[in-house]
Structure formats: C-alpha cells, structure tokens
Amino acid sequence: MTLRLSRRAYAEMYGPTTGDRIRLADTELLIEVERDHTLYGEEVKFGGGKVIRDGMGQSQLPAADVADTVITNAVILDHWGIVKADIAIKHGRIAAIGKAGNPDIQPGVTIAIGAATEIIAGEGLIVTAGGIDTHIHFISPQQIDEALASGVTTMIGGGTGPATGTNATTCTPGPWHMERMLQAADGWPINLGFLGKGNASRPQPLVEQIEAGAIGLKLHEDWGTTPAAIDNCLTVADDTDTQVAIHTDTLNEAGFVEATVAAFKGRTIHTYHTEGAGGGHAPDILKVCGEANVLPSSTNPTRPYTINTLDEHLDMLMVCHHLDPSIAEDLAFAESRIRRETIAAEDILHDLGALSMLSSDSQAMGRVGEVIIRTWQTAHKMKVQRGALTGDGARNDNFRAKRYVAKYTINPALTHGIAHEVGSIEPGKWADLVLWEPAFFGVKPAMIIKGGMIAVAQMGDPNASIPTPQPVHYREMFATRGGALARTSLTFVSQLALDAGISARYGLAKRLVPVRGCRTVTKRDMIHNAWQPAIRVDPETYDVVADGALLTCEPAAVLPMAQRYFLF
C-alpha cells in the first residue's frame, strides 16, 4: 500500500526533493535540487513513531560497519552540485553521500545505520562545507569565535597578536613566533595554518620559517615587496611546495604591475587584494586576473559595492596601515587606494569568475565574521543588476550559487594545498560541515560540525526543560572541550616541518597535516572561477575594461542578509 504525498507535504516531512526550489535567506537567489539520493517511500527519519528504530531503519550491524553519525535528508550545496542526500560521518570524516537505512530490509541503502549511529536531522536544512578564510591577520584570538559562528572552519594567515606589524600584515615572522602560534593553535576548535614573512632577498630567512611550520610565505608592501624579494620568495616556495601570498606595491615604488608580474616568472602565486580598494598596485592591480599563474582573491570590506563603501574605507585605511591623516603624503597614499570605478568592477569580476576567492582581511579593514554573508550579498546584487548567468535559467541560480560557494570553500583549499582534507563535501574529507535553515542561509548557521562532532550550535537556556527556550544564541559544544578539541580540528604545516618532527619538539596536541600541490595549481584549476580576461584600467578615469567590455555597476542602497537579521 502506498500513499501519494503532495510536494508541499513531502517537503514539510522530508525536506525538498528533485525539482523543488529554495530561496537563500532574503535574497533573490533560488537554488533547485538537481537530484535526490534518497528513495521515495524508504526515507529515514528519527523521532517518536518514525523510521530509525531497531529492526526498522536501524540495523543490527556492529559499530565497525555503520556510520558514527548520519545527517538525514539534507540538501547539499557544493561546487559539484545541489543534491538531496543522507550524509555519513565516520571517524571524523565524510564517509558517504547517499541513502541511509537498514540494508537488511531496505533497498538501495549505501549508508548503514546501527546502534552506534547518532542522527542529526537535516530535513529542511542546507549543508555546505566549512568556509576557508585565507586572509587572516591574527590580531586577536577572539576572531576565531566570530569566524566559527559564521560558518568558517579553517583560517589561514599570519600574525602574533595586536603588534603593529600584525595589524597591517598577515605574517608570523621567524621560527620563535611560528612555534608560539602553533602552540596557541592547540587551544582553538578550528583548523589553522600560518604564513611566514616572505620579504627577504636571500633564501635562509625564509626556509627556516617553512622548517618551523609555516604553510607558506606572505609578501607585503609594508615590508618591501620588491622584485628581488618576490623572486627569492617564489624560489623558496618552489623548493618547499608551499604557497606565496602577496600584497603588491600600492605606491609603485619598485615598479609597476608589469614589473611585479615579470618577477613572478610564470610561477604560481596567490594575489591578495586583487580588488578595487584594498591595496596593491594603484590603480591597475586588477590586471593580474588575466594571468594563468595568478590565483586572485579579494577581501570583504568592498563586498559588495554600496553607497557607504567609499566613506568607510578612508578611516579604516589610516588606522590599519599606521598612517597619519595630518601628513599629506600619508593621506595621498590612502586616497590612491580607494577608487569607486575599480570597486564597481570588482563586483562584476567576481560574478564572471575572474576573481576566484573571497576572504576577510580580519581586523585589518575586513570583518572576520562576514566572509560568507558578503559573498552571498555580492551574488544577490549581481543577479539583480545583471540578471541570470550563462548556465542558469528562469527557474534557478544553481550555477551562480556553485560559483560563489566555491570562492570560500574549494578554491582557497586548492590554492593553499589543503583540498585533500577540506573545502568540499566529498567522501574521505574531514567532516567540517555547516547546517543552515534556508531563511537564515549565509547569515546565521544552525550548527557547525568540526571533524564529525558538533562544535557550535544555537542553544537555548541551559537550565530550561528543553533546548529551545530563550535566550537562544551560539554556544560552544563538546567538540570544543578537553581532548576532543585536538581530535576534531587540524593544524596545517609544511611537509618540511612535519619531517623535522615539530609536533614532538613543540609539544603539540593537534594532528598536523602537510600542505601539498601548492606549486602546480593554476588559474585553470579555480573551480567555476577560472576566467582570464585581458584587463585594462584607465590611469586617468580608473575605468575597467575586460576583453573589450566596460565593467561598471551602480552601488547598492539596500542589501539582503542585513539589518532584519541583526535587530538583537
């Protein structure tokens, strides 16, 4: 005997299925479920009178043969697709994406549930991979709380605290500081990787930082990003399979953008601040988007272009780069970096996939908890102003959604050599997952899972009789306590450091994972974000032309995912 359910009734019970559409928060973005891995009539759901009970949806198999945790009936949004499925987690990793249940009595089961299995109800929820922020100034450890609660589960950057150097540059300089920061990483329930200072004209000062545990090196103009420093840094990176991130020369003191590109010599590099106002060669740093060896990212303070963007930036810049507004030269330096035309073009270059990544620039002009919000605000603004992307139709924005989610998940992972562990929802990867109610998508996660265990969740009064009474806010869960912390989060290091035995030497508790493949990744590998246009920026008007087309758009006066979500 079968019962035919209406689409509405089915969605309310088991979540959306193939062909159903979901609005992302209060944006104009709609995603459509492309495939449903669960079988109609054989869905599993936990609760009183539901399916996951002994002898029904729960099998008699031992712990070794069943999932540790199953997220049931979730909608997965990732660079590779938008699907409905059950997600299995085993030993802290994603074990399978498919159909959960009892293989003894149910057809099509690819994920076995047993007495050893915990259930997280994913009905009606969207699941994304944990975000990766690759532009972190480690100024204050409290940034980690903000980032984690926003859905970011991996942070890459540099610094030592609120030192003047760290306030301006993302560098953890030298072996002593590197050791201290790696020891500090043991205390935080998030994946971390640190960049050493790359500004040196001889190899030894750089190699010793890689040996100490740096996953890469950061070249910053405030330390002198000369062609000699660039060439030396990239040579060391090639020898150690680590990445180089660069903040180029705003003042064009050591050469123009062409001189910097020439110093790259075709070698892979992650260009920070490939944007309209964040820094780097003024006014034409955007030109590097067209280089095959350049992996470009921009930061969130200019995301998206709004009526308030320009006014906000001048004061931020003066503080972050230790400038004095009473000195004419300092003021001119700041004003040269803030250009409405290039900021507007940045929106469009993101939408067309020329800019491959988006990050925060935390407490150094960017907001660490707003990478995900501002990514989707940019996607919304571009849909409203530019319409559907090629590949999307009238029914959904699936391609645009895949393009934008890739900017803070898989592409940063590929760039920094950690995609074998994180960056997407795929079997074998570390189970860093973010669960969202669609109405709060991109703004306020319902739950953040780290290494297969719940790390942060919205939780009500701990003294209440049920979990939901007010005040409901983000609270750290058991994955952040005791020995579980070190077993549910990772610290990324170089292979050179791992071979040198820094784990034992520094007394580290977290698992150390080496980065790999940093030197072979190219712009072509940036998923859904690999466009290499020929860009020209007019030195007088700052107009941006890409492949012959003028890139311009109006600033937004109103944005979604904003004040209505943050009244309290």
Curated annotation (Swiss-Prot):
UniProt keyword list: Cytoplasm, Hydrolase, Metal-binding, Nickel
Active site annotation, chain numbering: 321
Query: What EC class is this?
Result: hydrolase
Cofactor binding note: Binds 2 nickel ions per subunit.
Q: What is its main location?
A: cytoplasm
Q: Where is the Urease domain?
A: 130-568
Q: What is this protein called?
A: Urease subunit alpha
Species of origin: Burkholderia pseudomallei (strain K96243)
